[in-house]
């Protein structure tokens, strides 16, 4: 398995309440493994690895649990938390692979596809789905965007898309993604919506 070239860190945001799901989404088993473990396995090549979640809620070997700086404020706040933690350990700057906990089809190969686009001058790398929309919850962000994330949150903005609109973004076209990862953006919002073909 190809390793992600350094310096790349990883974070999974798992601080949500799972209200629509009806149970703890991160621990729901798909293909015999909890969603949290499936997403984490796709990011094994990255370091450091951070789980954005309440302290003590989950046990994920090899991952540091970092509590949300703004609990209950959504994934943009989770991204801020991860970037803030990175800034404390690596102020020189690096890339962060940021993933939601409900994407069971993420793979190391998908992340490698994104890292290949992380060139100089870029602030984020994201893929496009079949409708041409960006997918901010399975994307790369440069640690230098922390101030922009915090400014959005301070101003009451919670949408991940609002961040991408303000960044220099490299986009991976859907045709390239679909050729090897056609189900990568299928997420699990409610139990009846479990994607088929997960093994």
What role is predicted for each listed range?
Residues 2-160, 165-184, 192:
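Nucleotide and nucleotide-moiety/phosphate-recognizing core
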């Amino acid at each position: 398995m190809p390793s992600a070239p350094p310096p790349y860190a990883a974070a999974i945001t798992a601080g949500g309440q799972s209200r629509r799901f009806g149970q703890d989404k991160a621990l729901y088993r798909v293909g015999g493994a909890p969603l949290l473990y499936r997403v984490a396995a796709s990011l094994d090549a990255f370091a450091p690895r951070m789980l954005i979640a309440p302290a003590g809620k989950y046990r994920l070997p090899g991952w540091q649990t970092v509590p949300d700086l703004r609990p209950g404020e959504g994934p943009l706040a989770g991204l801020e938390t991860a970037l803030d933690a990175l800034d404390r350990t690596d102020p020189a700057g690096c890339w962060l692979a940021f993933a939601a906990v409900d994407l069971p089809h993420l793979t190391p190969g998908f992340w490698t596809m994104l890292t290949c686009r992380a060139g100089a001058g870029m602030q984020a790398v994201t893929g496009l789905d079949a409708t041409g929309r960006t997918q901010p919850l399975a994307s790369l962000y440069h640690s230098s965007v922390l101030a922009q994330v915090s400014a959005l949150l301070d101003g009451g903005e919670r949408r991940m898309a609002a961040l991408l609109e303000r960044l220099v973004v490299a986009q991976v076209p859907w045709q390239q993604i679909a050729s090897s990862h056609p189900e990568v953006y299928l997420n699990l919002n409610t139990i009846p919506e479990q994607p088929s073909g997960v093994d």
